[in-house]
């Protein structure tokens, strides 16, 4: 009889689960790793970063940073961290980590500590080259805080996906799906790249990918309980609010005009956020996800019945 007790695990198994978290964190950083990991050009950099001609910017001369530490890459950095966390949570669930005492903690420790190391290295690298002025301290603090918030959000995603019931896990999967789209965009179109060849087919996939992934998560969880219904609704809400928030934060953070005016910047963020919420593109994604999920749920029931009918009695 199943008593609900979790199986104790050895120290070796704990290390293996921790390694899963580390590998997931590294996978999350892939779109940045393939760029060469040069710290983005900084507005407050103390020394001029120019080519031998003395005029052209030379980003390749910037130091190595494990994260794209820049106000122009806040949402991309968050996507890298949350995607890695979502991969860790999914791996933990597939490996049935919640049935083993300490396994989820090991996975969580692996991914969070790895990401903290990456953030600390990037922040220290930036701090070493910034001008010695108040604006540098404010910028460094704000960017580091944003990274910490993303890591905390990722930790929540790990727990939701790896340990929570299906109704809550679908929310974690949906948050991970939104991050994955930004991750994929950075993989196809490397951030800060000067030359990119746009592909209409890839762009179309990136546009509809969030709706498809959120719908897939809803279909996986089902809607057989009140908790799962709530989880599905929250996932659709995240699909509506998440992209609007990303648009607002990216637009405001990338505008130097409001850098010294936090209240005005907050007002601009609010205006862009409200406009993005009412954008037809945002609503199309939500409607598409709802339709795909409805079709998937309708097909899910007979498929499960057929599978149950084939199982031995």
Which ranges hold each PLM region?
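Long, glycine/tryptophan/cysteine-rich extracytoplasmic
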Residues: 19-22, 28-78, 128-130, 188, ...
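Cytoplasmic membrane-interface segments at the C-terminal ends of transmembrane helices
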Residues: 2-14, 86-107, 127-130, 153-176, ...
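Generic multipass alpha-helical transmembrane bundles of integral membrane proteins
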Residues: 115-264
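Alpha-helical transmembrane segments
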Residues: 14-32, 108-117
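Hydrophobic alpha-helical transmembrane segments
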Residues: 71-92, 145-155, 206-219, 288-293
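Membrane-entry segments of alpha-helical transmembrane domains in multi-pass membrane proteins
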Residues: 10-19, 64-80, 101, 105, ...
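Hydrophobic core segments of alpha-helical transmembrane domains in multi-pass membrane transport
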Residues: 20-32, 85-86, 175-182, 212-219, ...
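Long, hydrophobic/aromatic-enriched structural stretches that serve as scaffold segments
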Residues: 67-129
């Amino acid at each position: 009889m199943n008593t609900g007790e979790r199986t104790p695990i050895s120290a070796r198994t704990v290390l293996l689960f921790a390694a899963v978290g580390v590998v997931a964190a590294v996978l999350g950083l892939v779109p940045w790793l393939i760029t060469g990991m040069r710290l983005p050009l900084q507005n407050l950099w103390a020394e001029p970063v120019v080519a031998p001609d003395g005029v052209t910017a030379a980003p390749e001369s910037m130091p190595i940073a494990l994260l794209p530490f820049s106000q122009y890459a806040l949402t991309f950095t968050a996507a890298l961290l949350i995607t890695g966390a979502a991969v860790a949570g999914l791996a933990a669930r597939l490996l049935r980590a919640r049935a083993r005492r300490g396994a989820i903690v090991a996975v969580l420790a692996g991914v969070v500590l790895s990401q903290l190391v990456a953030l600390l290295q990037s922040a220290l690298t930036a701090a070493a080259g910034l001008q010695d002025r108040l604006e540098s301290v404010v910028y460094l603090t704000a960017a580091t805080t944003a990274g910490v918030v993303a890591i905390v959000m990722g930790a929540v995603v790990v727990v939701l996906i790896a340990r929570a019931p299906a109704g809550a896990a679908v929310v974690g999967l949906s948050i991970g799906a939104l991050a994955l789209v930004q991750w994929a965009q950075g993989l196809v179109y490397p951030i800060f790249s000067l030359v990119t060849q746009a592909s209409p087919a890839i762009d179309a996939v990136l546009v509809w990918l969030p709706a498809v992934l959120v719908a897939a998560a809803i279909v996986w969880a089902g809607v057989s309980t009140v908790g799962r219904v709530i989880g599905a609704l929250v996932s659709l809400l995240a699909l509506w609010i998440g992209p609007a928030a990303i648009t607002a934060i990216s637009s405001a953070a990338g505008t130097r005009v409001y850098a010294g005016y936090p209240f005005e910047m907050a007002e601009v963020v609010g205006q862009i956020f409200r406009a993005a919420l009412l954008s037809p593109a945002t609503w199309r994604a939500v409607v598409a996800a709802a339709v795909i999920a409805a079709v998937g749920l309708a097909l899910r029931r007979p498929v499960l019945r057929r599978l149950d009918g084939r199982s031995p009695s």
